[in-house]
């Protein structure tokens, strides 16, 4: 794989990851359950790191990372939360399945390992999304004292 091909490969991976990220940010606004939303915030935080890593890898090859054309909407969906999360998990699984078979073609060990690490974390995110869809109270773990937190979060901070 030539440096130009590697750059194009990384840019495409970045674009698709960025699209998932933007969609997930929109989806998180409709997931009000405390534990499920905390799971979403965990996944979103890791995806921000993935995008930064990819951007750095692209820059090291002399390229620039193009952000998603989609914008984050401030609206929430009235659709059933389980179906929203299931659709999000389905998109993530399709992404992981597609790229898992392609990444081994990268001959640059550093960039191949980076993408393998990102895909591995994205597989773990699927577990979090599935637990969130089930409305499990232990999406991110259990409290040491057995306490179960309940409640909801707001979709966005109120404007003053």
State what each model feature region is.
Residues 1-160:
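Iron-associated oxidoreductase/ferritin-like identity signal
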């Amino acid at each position: 794989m030539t440096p130009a091909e590697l750059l194009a490969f990384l840019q495409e991976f970045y674009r698709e990851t960025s699209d998932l990220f933007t969609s997930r940010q929109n989806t998180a606004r409709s997931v009000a359950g405390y534990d499920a939303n905390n799971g979403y915030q965990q996944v979103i935080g890791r995806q921000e790191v993935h995008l930064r890593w990819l951007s750095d890898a692209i820059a090291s090859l002399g390229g620039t990372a193009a952000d998603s054309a989609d914008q984050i909407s401030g609206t929430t969906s009235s659709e059933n939360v389980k179906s929203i999360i299931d659709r999000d998990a389905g998109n993530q699984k399709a992404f992981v399945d597609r790229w898992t078979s392609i990444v081994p073609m990268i001959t640059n060990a550093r960039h191949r390992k980076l993408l393998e690490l990102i895909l591995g974390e994205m597989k773990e995110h699927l577990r979090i999304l599935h637990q969130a869809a089930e409305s499990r109270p232990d999406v991110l773990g259990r409290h040491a004292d057995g306490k179960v937190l309940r409640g909801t979060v707001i979709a966005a901070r109120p404007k003053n």
